[in-house]
């Protein structure tokens, strides 16, 4: 039926081969519909001199046209006015459902897009091997992406995921990662060493303060009842975005554990690493103490913020400016001294653990 060129059927046909096949199919169609004189006239006019092998009726051209016409009539814009088969309608419906959606169209609610510069190779090319034009898998953004915005997730999960535990030589136990809570922007400084300081405004975008909270080794996580979220806001780019602590491994969050309940500001924030302060106090990460992740700040009530910890401790967090951070519904009085400006807390200096303290939001 294919005549010349059948041996090259596996190769891409050339234009001349395509014209020859079309001429054969037209001749075959004319013969099958009973137009023998027209078929012979057609061959003589195109000066066909090769042997012809006919296929079974109704022939390829007729069969191909019927399939095309059925699919053409079953298109969504014509299916109401043209007759079509259920198979053709199902084909169009499947093709519409399997059409590739725009990028970010299938992002799960718990994953977010990065804010600020995206590292090279962040968006890896992906395509379904079986259906190249079919549905693409959802684009998964790692929770440790730079400035990732998490979705609706609990602040402190009651159980840790054993499959995500990682050990570190500088920590007493395996470093257990937690899913970041709502409203918090996790920082993933895996591109920077423990002693390196990433540039400001490189980990967060405008209005997106960064704060990486997670456990170190030691005691298990507390499970506060009313610890829903820690809301805070920033109207200036890059505020409260800082690199990992001086001694912590990359990606280790820094949440302090208060030493005691005195009014001295030296009890909770001691042994600060020497990092030059910046304007508007741009660098304020918090990290775990050696006694347990988020040991004491796992839930501070309002009176702990203003009363027992004193103005020298947590009151300096709340500033009288749009670049403030609120860890409680009752922030302390603002103050302007540079006691904590731009410095990083040593994640291994806090020594007390208060499991009875709960966070009030």
Swiss-Prot record:
Ubiquitous. One of its GO terms (biological process) is positive regulation of transcription by RNA polymerase II. This is Single-stranded DNA-binding protein 2. The modification Phosphoserine is found at residue 321. PROSITE patterns: LISH. The gene is SSBP2. Keywords: Acetylation, DNA-binding, Nucleus, Phosphoprotein. Residues 225-236, 317-332, 346-361 have a biased composition (Polar residues). The modification N6-acetyllysine is found at residue 6. It comes from Homo sapiens (Human). Residues 204-219, 289-299 have a biased composition (Gly residues).
């Amino acid at each position: 039926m294919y005549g010349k060129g059948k041996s090259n059927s596996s190769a891409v046909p050339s234009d001349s081969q395509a014209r020859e096949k079309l001429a054969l199919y037209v001749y075959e169609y004319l013969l099958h519909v009973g137009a023998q004189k027209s078929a012979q006239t057609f061959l003589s006019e195109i000066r066909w001199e090769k042997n012809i092998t006919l296929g079974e009726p109704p022939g390829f051209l007729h069969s191909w046209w019927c399939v095309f016409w059925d699919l053409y009539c079953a298109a969504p814009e014509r299916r109401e006015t043209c007759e079509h088969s259920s198979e053709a309608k199902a084909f169009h419906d499947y093709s519409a459902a399997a059409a590739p959606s725009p990028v970010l169209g299938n992002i799960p609610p718990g994953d977010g897009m990065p804010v600020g510069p995206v590292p090279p190779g962040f968006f890896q090319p992906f395509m379904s091997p079986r259906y190249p034009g079919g549905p693409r898998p959802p684009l998964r953004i790692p929770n440790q992406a730079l400035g990732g915005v998490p979705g609706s997730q609990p602040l402190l999960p009651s159980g840790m995921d054993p499959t995500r535990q990682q050990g570190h030589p500088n920590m007493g136990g395996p470093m257990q990662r937690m899913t970041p809570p709502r409203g918090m922007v996790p920082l993933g400084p895996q591109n920077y060493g423990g002693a390196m300081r990433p540039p400001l405004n490189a980990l967060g975008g405008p209005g997106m303060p960064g704060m990486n909270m997670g456990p170190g080794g030691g005691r298990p996580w507390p499970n506060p009842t009313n610890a829903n979220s820690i809301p805070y806001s920033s109207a200036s780019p890059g505020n409260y975005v800082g690199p990992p602590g001086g001694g912590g491994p990359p990606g280790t969050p820094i949440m302090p554990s208060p030493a005691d309940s005195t009014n001295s500001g030296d009890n909770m924030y001691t042994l600060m690493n020497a990092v030059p302060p910046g304007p508007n106090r741009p660098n304020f990460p918090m990290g775990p103490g050696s006694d347990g992740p988020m040991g004491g700040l796992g839930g501070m009530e309002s009176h702990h913020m203003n009363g027992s910890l004193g103005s020298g401790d947590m009151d300096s967090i709340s500033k009288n400016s749009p670049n403030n951070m609120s860890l409680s519904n009752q922030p302390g009085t603002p103050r302007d001294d540079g006691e904590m400006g731009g410095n990083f807390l040593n994640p291994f200096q806090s020594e007390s653990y208060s499991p009875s303290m709960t966070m009030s939001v």
